[in-house]
């Protein structure tokens, strides 16, 4: 598909957008669970164990709260389970969440660096290094290029509030596209209007438009239905 896919709706794009809106803000239960259930969260470690702990944590938060969980709440919950892997998981997560909560970046460069650090830490999870699947495949590459371009131009951005940075990032990521370089079938292409004008084909099959303007629909007739008019050669 020559139009590509919106970067903002890809897995890396969604994760980066979630994090951009959470920096310096109180974390609600729903916002926390949105992050934990994202397919890239803790993708660098044991994803199955992460999902198991996320499920158990959700049950506790839904029943007992708190409404605005912080890192200490997660560590306390994990310590009560007497499970070493759960405690390691909670401590890793708490460090990332507390960094996002208490961060006070001012310059654009600081916003970008913090944003990338949080995304990579969340995707890495309990793995000793790396960034999980955050920058992998076409969508990850497009997201990485966006962050690197923003960092390269950040010196000209001056100081921004957290809300200003969130709005800036939203506007940039919504312009991004993810293009799949792999042709699914050599004889089938889905082209936009611009690309279609630049191509030639030995056979062109014209289909109807969605709005029904072409081919034009026959006018209603009080005497003959469409089939009768077609049989009579009137269509």
Where are these regions (language model features)?
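Polyanion-engaging groove/track-forming segments
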Residues: 1-235
């Amino acid at each position: 598909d020559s139009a590509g896919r919106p970067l903002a709706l890809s897995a890396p794009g969604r994760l980066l957008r979630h994090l951009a809106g959470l920096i310096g803000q109180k974390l609600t239960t729903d916002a926390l669970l949105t992050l934990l259930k994202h397919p890239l969260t803790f993708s660098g470690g044991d994803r199955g164990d992460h999902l198991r702990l996320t499920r158990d944590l959700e049950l506790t938060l839904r029943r007992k709260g708190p409404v605005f969980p912080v890192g200490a709440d997660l560590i306390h919950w994990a310590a009560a389970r007497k499970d070493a892997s759960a405690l390691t998981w909670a401590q890793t997560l708490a460090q990332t969440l507390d960094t996002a909560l208490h961060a006070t970046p001012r310059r654009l460069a600081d916003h970008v660096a913090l944003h990338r650090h949080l995304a990579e830490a969340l995707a890495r999870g309990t793995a000793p290094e790396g960034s999980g699947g955050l920058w992998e495949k076409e969508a990850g590459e497009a997201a990485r290029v966006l962050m690197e371009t923003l960092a390269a131009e950040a010196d000209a951005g001056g100081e921004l509030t957290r809300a200003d940075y969130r709005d800036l990032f939203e506007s940039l990521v919504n312009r991004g596209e993810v293009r799949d370089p792999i042709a699914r079938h050599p004889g089938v292409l889905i082209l936009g209007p611009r690309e279609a004008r630049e191509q030639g084909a030995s056979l062109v099959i014209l289909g109807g438009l969605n709005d029904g303007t072409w081919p034009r629909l026959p006018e209603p007739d009080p005497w003959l239905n469409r089939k009768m008019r077609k049989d009579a050669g009137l269509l």
